């Protein structure tokens, strides 16, 4: 099976492919070293090769490697930042760089695997997911009843999810709603774009509020009104304020680092499935994100909870 991808931002080849293919960098390194990757028709065997905007990256996978097999979640001994836990649910602050759910190449290195290890191999289920390089609040259920209850809240918009996004350039409007349907980019299995009202496009809505901005950048609050793949990242690119360091949807002139996009799931609120009371939790930014805000002189309060009401 062969796939070809277009580069939009300058970055390392292994970082680019790890994001697109949702693989660990160890697995991507093996693909590159084994000679399965070429750039603009030239075989590349160096992981740190820098790809540039408009480069064409071709991956030639073996059929055996692409054989579809069920993915079994393997327990992963990884320290979790648990914000809340009881017999029904877990609320966790997911770190940047950790996938939510295992793929066929990452059976053990996932947040779900870490939760399974923490729960002594007792069943645990993801209520929703976050992209690998998106940090922040993620919720898990410990039984099917709680899972269905919480997923229904997602569908009916009872559950509220708020994100912090660091974007390029100041915004003219300090608040608003982005209404733009999303569809896949051709046959690309990873990237999405704003489409039209065809059958392929899915309605998507994102509310935003500017928290702080200057002549270079803005820190904005985003609320998901729908939950499409890469929704916030594509919507912000669409209004010409792409997320900083986004390897898929960022500025072409920006060389993305391994940290990935500066996007953080800051807060979640929901009705507890058995206690029947409203609960809310907030996840703190990691040091890399906080330092980036300091470097851009975008100060924020120690706690943003009041901003997410």
Swiss-Prot record:
Residues 11-87 form the S4 RNA-binding domain. SMART domains: S4 (SM00363). SUPFAM superfamilies: Alpha-L RNA-binding motif, Pseudouridine synthase. Pfam families: PseudoU_synth_2, S4. It catalyses: a uridine in RNA = a pseudouridine in RNA. Keywords: Isomerase, RNA-binding. The keyword Isomerase applies. Coiled coil: none annotated. It is an enzyme of class 5 (isomerase). Signal peptide: none annotated. GO terms for biological process: enzyme-directed rRNA pseudouridine synthesis. GO terms for molecular function: RNA binding; rRNA pseudouridine synthase activity. Belongs to the pseudouridine synthase RluA family. This is Uncharacterized RNA pseudouridine synthase MG209 homolog. It comes from Mycoplasma pneumoniae (strain ATCC 29342 / M129 / Subtype 1).
